[in-house]
Amino acid sequence: MSNEAKCPFNHTAGSGTSNRDWWPKQLRVDLLAQHSSKSNPMGEDFDYAEAFKSLDLAAVKADLAKVMTDSQDWWPADFGHYGPLFVRMAWHSAGTYRIGDGRGGAGRGQQRFAPLNSWPDNVNLDKARRLLWPVKQKYGNKISWADLLILTGNVALETMGFKTFGFAGGRADVWEPDLDVYWGTESTWLGGDDRYGKGKGSSSQGEIPADAHRHGQEQARTAPAGRNLENPLAAVQMGLIYVNPEGPEGNPDPLAAAHDIRETFARMAMDDEETVALIAGGHTFGKTHGAGDAKHVGREPEGEDMDSQGLGWKSSFGSGVGGDTISSGLEVTWTQTPAQWSNYFFENLFKYEWELTKSPAGAHQWVAKGADAVIPHAHGGAPLLPTMLTTDLSLRFDPAYEKISRRFLEHPEQFADAFARAWFKLTHRDLGPRSRYLGPEVPAEELIWQDPLPQAEGAQIDAADVAALKAKVLGSGLSVPELVATAWASASTFRGGDMRGGANGARIRLAPQKDWAANQPAQLAKVLKTLEGIQSAFNQGGKKVSLADLIVLAGSAAVEKAAQDAGVAVAVPFRAGRVDASQEQTDAASFAPLEPIVDGFRNFQKQRYAVRGEDMLIDKAQQLTLSAPEMTVLVGGLRVLGNNVGGSTKGMFTDRVGVLSNDFFVNLLDMATEWKSTSPAQEEFEGRDRKTGAVKWAGTRVDLVFGSNAVLRALAEVYASADAKEKFVKDFVAAWVKVMELDRFDLK
């Protein structure tokens, strides 16, 4: 008998058949417990922003500059410079961002973890991060991996002769993979059938349907048949950052590839000019790697053996490194100076006619007809012919891209400026507003995609002012539901993925938010008109209150009144300091994806979707950075406060709407009530008296899940208990204030 067989332990913690094995559609309440203090080795007192402020950024950059040309035998630098590798590393760290849901991106250093550390498109970037370890080790916790990856990309560009637009730190690391990001449902790497619905543009598995976001809608209307990419995905195949460089599904058609490029880059919030600049700028440097057949390449890092120590993609082709490297399978070097900024990309793109060929690994690529061998070999071999990818040729043959490309060819200074700005946007898009930017290289120029805010002016309102304003609001004739709904609508646009949205700026009074269906435009206009009157009268006295502050203050006053009416005296904490943005500071197209097409906290769905309402509630709660208890108490409180959209009474399990009671939980869990579905899809339900059969309540999946899901029921029972009256109010107020202050980075 082997030693293994003699082991007295035949199980370990977490092994065996899991709950999700038995019930694959089980609600993922666990998504609300990510990145807790239990996974963070730094402790609750660690303040990354303060640590970063003590960093000598110039010294870090000097050390990074040395790394660029310090070629290591275990992974030799192409052209004697690691710059191109680090540009790709930084790009792929940031390039997972998508504007549709604000997830992905560079902000948490997720490239270190699965699945990103093992994506086919990230092949051999494990080596790039290992090259950086001595620098990370030296500066320790003063610079996060998330910041270091982006800073290294900037230093790479600068050491290759390019002037960058700037750099901002502030990306705090997390210590485990993000579990909430929807990357698609394909079960094979580089699969794309599900996201294109096998030719039908299906959206049944995503968070939202394919027509839910307006960003890039024009391109979607002209998509080739069956080429409608599921939202919010921004990559054409599982494990790619954007597009297949060989062309759609390997078809080397530059025009077809242009559609995929335009759609995926638009979903990362890039327009045509930014797209051209990024592709051409990135491909000014370095090369792709396809020295031999991919069969020589081993497993990705997550699938490798322990002695590989987190490295993957070992190659048995030749030396496996240097000139024998296999990464993408393509073997393309774009310019005559791959480690130096130039305009050679556009010069070569338009100078030559291009002939389809294949790389040594068998991948489709293009070679210049009749050209001289002017391209240097990465490791000292004979010069090479100019080569391009199918997606590079898209910049010449797509009419819109071609116009921009020719302008950049003729005006290199415009190209350099466009690339600098697009690179900064790419690497900072998910960092949030400028108030989160740290370090001496933050650019002074304010950019529209940063959702700019004006500076606060004058003294902030004090406690006496707050009390006076609350009295004015409560005496204005506006109801508790109206005030609560307006404050919630203003604050709950916040997305933890990219730190956008929230109450600061009072953009709820501007396009597009003032017209969103979830915000009940007619009611909203009425409330805002009344609040603006109160604001105007108050501001006559010398001190100023912003409408952004007043909206939140009014909602908080309503919560206090509702609690008092329930017999609980409570003061809702309020901190002034919000400002009012202008329409000129608000890019309506950029804000369109923030529209709540579903909001379980308001029992609102703009239309019926294939995704279950309770799953979308979890999604919304996760964006609001809520825990499961916070989500639970907010739903229960907002229902009895009348926060539903359009006069719906579903889920309002109370006969005293506007009173902050625990009635929602008490009545939901009442065994005298029997619930039955009233729709074939089990979307809506009636609660009937078990004895008389009389209808008592009506609810939706988002309501009944707090009784049907075991985890949520356990939480609901806490708030339904006889001794929970004060705890319920206290917990609701804490969660309410959290949401109201999610975008108050000036307080954190």
From Swiss-Prot:
Gene Ontology BP terms: cellular response to hydrogen peroxide; hydrogen peroxide catabolic process
Cofactor note: Binds 1 heme b (iron(II)-protoporphyrin IX) group per dimer.
Needed co-factor(s): heme b
EC number: 1.11.1.21
Cross-linked residues, Tryptophyl-tyrosyl-methioninium (Trp-Tyr) (with M-268): W91-Y242
Cross-link (Tryptophyl-tyrosyl-methioninium (Tyr-Met) (with W-91)): Y242-M268
Keywords: Heme, Hydrogen peroxide, Iron, Metal-binding, Oxidoreductase, Peroxidase
Site feature Transition state stabilizer, where: R88
GO molecular-function terms, A-Z: catalase activity; heme binding; metal ion binding
Active site: H92
Self-association state and partner proteins as the record states: Homodimer or homotetramer.
Family designation: Belongs to the peroxidase family. Peroxidase/catalase subfamily.
Stated role: Bifunctional enzyme with both catalase and broad-spectrum peroxidase activity.
Protein name: Catalase-peroxidase
Record organism: Herbaspirillum seropedicae (strain SmR1)
